Each structure stands twice: as C-alpha cells, then as structure tokens.
Swiss-Prot record:
Organism of this sequence: Clostridium botulinum (strain Kyoto / Type A2)
Subunit structure: Homodimer.
Record GO terms (molecular function): 3-oxoacyl-[acyl-carrier-protein] synthase activity; beta-ketoacyl-acyl-carrier-protein synthase III activity
EC code(s) of this entry: 2.3.1.180
Entries under PANTHER family matching the protein: 3-OXOACYL-[ACYL-CARRIER-PROTEIN] SYNTHASE 3 (PTHR34069), BETA-KETOACYL-[ACYL-CARRIER-PROTEIN] SYNTHASE III (PTHR34069:SF2)
Residue positions of the active site: 112, 251, 281
Protein name: Beta-ketoacyl-[acyl-carrier-protein] synthase III
UniProt region (ACP-binding), positions on chain: 252-256
Length: 326
C-alpha cells in the first residue's frame, strides 16, 4: 500500500491588522492584559475577503508549492465553521475557482480540530481508492461570528486560511493519527444556536445567536489534557521520543495552553512552533497557516519528524505524526 505525504502548503491572511491597542478602544481591555493572558499581539481581520476567497488563495499557493496542476487533484476537503453559504459547499466553490474539475469536494465542521480531521479523512480516502492527490484547507472568517463587545472572546480570534496537498508516495510521510470527540462538554464552546420555534408553518424571521461563547476555564483544562493525551498517544504509536521530534505544531489558541502542555510533557516550550502573536486564533486555519509559514521560512527539512495537534469546539481533538517530505 502506498504511503501518503505532504507535498505542498499554502496560506492566506488578510492585510488588515487589528492590534491590541485598537481593541482597547472598543472594549475594556489593554495590550498588557491581552498579551499576558494569551500571547496575542495582533490579529488579521478580513475587509471584504470572504471564506471562499481566502480558501481559494491558500489553495493556489499550495498547488504552486506542490508543483502540480489543479486538475491533478482528486479530492478537496475544506474545514470551516464560517462558510459563506450552506450550498454550494466551500470546497465546491474552491473547485470552481481553481479549475479542479476531477476532484470530489465536501466541507467538514470540527472547529479548531477541523484541519486534523480533514487530514485523517483524506488519508483514509487516498489509501482505499483510486484517488492520488488531495487538497485539505482550513479556512475561517471568525470576525463575523465574534461578539465585539465581549472582551473575553473578541481579543482571541482572527481570519485566514491555510492549505496542504497530500499525495500517494513511496516515501515515509503521514504515519499515525489520534483523534476523538467529547460532546458531553460541547456546551463550553458554542456558536449559532438555532431557535426551536422556527418552523415552515410560521413566517417568523430566522433568529439565531451568531456569536462565539466560551467557558475559558473549562476549555483551558480540556485543551491541556487533550494535547497531552494526543501527543503521548502518538509517541506510543510511533515509538518516537520527543527528543527526535523537531517541532510540535499545535492549534494556535493561547500561549499559556502551550506552556502548560510543554511542562506536562517535560519538554521545552520552544519545541512548540507559535505564531499566534501575529494571527490570534484562526480555528481550523491555524495549523495549516503555521505549517505553511514554517515551510516558507525553511524551518523544516526532509525527514524531519513533526507532530500536528489540535483541539476545539465540539469538543474535538486530534493529532498526527508526519515525516516531512518537501
């Protein structure tokens, strides 16, 4: 059976930068308060760029980086909480924009774990079918579902998209996954609760709560536990020692979560790649944006061992061990 490797990456973030100082003019906060509690200095907020546009731009970069054509793609999966439409899917819209006429396309919704889930689904589909190449995108326009009057959440999130292309290869590449869900704790991170009285028999306008709501303490506790469990499980499956792992690329939610996880694993914080100071929490886009940034900066060499790990609403979590092949 063929191996599956990452052969290209891409990303897109809006040019519009919103600083902590700016946020302090609209909610009761400060640069110092945000920095010390989250590690975030600024975030990118879309100015007209929708989810499809950002996803498409990241896809174009990944295709170029992989040195393939769009019609070489057999599968497109987009992980997003913030689609522009329910139909057509964001993946189908990206297919149209890039001309990937041979691709099967669909979206998934797994919050900040979405990119990891997308990788696992794509690997399974490539291994068990005639398909050879897949495009996985994490794309979010979170600014449209953030409550800009809630200082506990509006300081956290940003917009952007990241993408990776997978291909069947003879080289060692994507090795082991560990993923799961805990719906019992889903109430701690929510968005978009539809009203039960919206029925075909009523002419009421659809009402819904569009804003992200989060129980920060519970999510922090869950995140540290899920990250630790996932990384340890992947180590057990791969027989990797953390000293062999060049980088852990985690969901970019909060620097404190990463620091606590590093302590639990008895490893240095610098093993975790972080760029949340520039982009904030971009949900499903955060891991592929970080991966592409590392690729562009030349931080990853062929045969490097890396672990990707995510956690988020649902509640969801997941991780994957990868031997870098670019």
């Amino acid at each position: 059976m063929s191996n599956i490797s990452v052969i290209g990456t891409g990303s897109y973030v809006p040019n519009n930068i919103i600083t902590n100082d700016f946020l302090s003019t609209i909610v009761d906060t400060s640069d110092e308060w945000i920095r010390t509690r989250t590690g975030i200095l600024e975030r990118r907020i879309s100015k007209g760029e929708n989810t499809i546009y950002m996803a498409t731009e990241s896809a174009k970069e990944a295709i170029k980086n992989a040195n393939i054509e769009a019609n070489d793609l057999d599968l497109i999966i987009v992980a997003t909480l913030t689609p522009d439409n329910f139909m057509p899917s964001t993946a189908c819209s990206v297919q149209k924009e890039i001309g990937a006429i041979n691709a099967l396309c669909f979206d998934i919704s797994a919050a900040c774990s979405g990119f990891i889930y997308g990788l696992e689904i794509a690997c399974s589909m490539l291994k068990n079918s005639f398909r050879n190449k897949a495009l996985i995108i994490g794309a979010e326009n979170l600014s449209k579902i953030v409550d800009w009057e809630d200082r506990n959440t509006c300081v956290l999130f940003g917009d952007g998209a990241g993408a990776a292309i997978l291909s069947k290869t003879k080289e060692e590449g994507i090795l082991e996954f560990h993923s799961g869900s805990n719906g019992l704790k889903g109430e701690h991170l929510t968005c978009g609760v539809l009203k039960a009285n919206n029925t075909p028999n009523k002419n009421d306008r659809l009402e819904k709560n569009n804003f992200i709501k989060m129980n920060g303490k519970e999510i922090f506790r869950f995140a540290v536990g899920a990250m630790n469990e996932t990384i340890c499980n992947i180590q057990e499956k791969t027989k990797w020692n953390l000293n062999e792992v060049k980088y852990i690329i985690s969901h970019q939610a909060n620097s404190r979560i990463i620091e606590y996880t590093a302590k639990k694993l008895n490893t240095e914080k610098d093993k975790f790649y972080m760029n949340l100071d520039k982009y904030g929490n971009t949900s499903a886009a955060s891991i592929p944006i970080a991966l592409d940034e590392m690729n562009k900066r030349g931080l990853l060499n062929k045969k490097d061992k890396i672990i990707l790990v995510g956690f988020g609403g649902g509640l969801t979590f997941g991780g994957v061990a990868i031997v870098w092949s670019i």
